[in-house]
């Protein structure tokens, strides 16, 4: 009985120490995050990065995500992409990490990686308006208007009076020679934003 009592006391002591350690770790990480925000607000990204590197844990999604953003803002694009990728590896369904990855990937000119990131987001959330819009814009910029059309069409189906979606859907229809559809859409844009220069320009190309 005495042996059992001692075992229970030791187990409780170890549990208390474990919880205390976790509490101390969280406090240290929270302090590092707080300081990183203060440095970020003042524009001192290197110091914000240093604060988090002091408590860096490669298994922490939050720390990797935050460092991905800070290193991107500091202009360390390759390092930023690596942190975001680590966050994605830790949380494969994270949409925010995938969006984050597109920032340094875009800055580095890795457009295939950017497109793949948006496609991965749409596998998880097919109705994501931001991913649909940005992916459509990439295809539009590459003059792949047929592919761009399906992404803008989805946005307009979800948000029929959204300015950005309507405008790009109108221009894409125009580029594909669908003048009647484009005319209707440009006029809807003008209901949303009267005197919109882009919509007026588009209508001028039809008439």
Region spans (language model):
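Bacterial N-terminal signal peptides
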Residues: 10-18
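Structural marker of alpha-solenoid helical repeat scaffolds
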Residues: 56-58, 90, 124, 158-159, ...
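Alpha-helical segment of the N-proximal tetratricopeptide repeat
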Residues: 28-57, 62, 66-73, 103-106
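Terminal, low-structured helical/coil segments at or just beyond the last alpha-helical repeat
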Residues: 26-28, 175-207
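Helix-start (N-cap) detector for alpha-helical repeat units in TPR-like alpha-solenoids
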Residues: 29, 61-63, 95-96, 129-130, ...
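Mid-chain, structured segments of secreted extracytoplasmic proteins
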Residues: 61-112
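Structural signature of tandem alpha-helical TPR/SEL1-like repeats
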Residues: 41-50, 74-86, 107-120, 141-154, ...
């Amino acid at each position: 009985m005495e042996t059992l009592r001692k075992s229970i006391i030791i187990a409780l002591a170890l549990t208390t120490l474990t919880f205390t350690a976790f509490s101390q770790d969280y406090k240290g990480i929270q302090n590092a995050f707080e300081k990183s925000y203060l440095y970020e607000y003042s524009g001192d990204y290197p110091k914000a990065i240093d604060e988090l590197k002091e408590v860096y844990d490669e298994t922490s999604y939050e720390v990797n995500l935050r460092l991905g953003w800070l290193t991107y803002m500091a202009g360390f694009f390759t390092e930023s992409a690596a942190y975001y990728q680590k966050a994605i590896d830790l949380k494969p369904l994270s949409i925010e990490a995938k969006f984050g990855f597109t920032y340094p990937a875009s800055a580095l000119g890795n457009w295939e990686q950017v497109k793949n990131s948006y496609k991965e987001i749409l596998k998880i959330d097919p109705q994501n308006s931001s991913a649909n819009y940005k992916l459509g814009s990439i295809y539009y910029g590459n003059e792949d208007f047929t592919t761009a059309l399906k992404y803008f069409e989805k946005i307009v189906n979800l948000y029929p009076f959204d300015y950005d979606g309507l405008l790009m859907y109108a221009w894409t229809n125009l580029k594909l020679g669908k003048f009647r559809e484009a005319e209707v859409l440009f006029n809807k844009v003008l209901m949303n934003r009267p005197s919109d220069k882009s919509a007026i320009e588009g209508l001028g190309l039809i008439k």
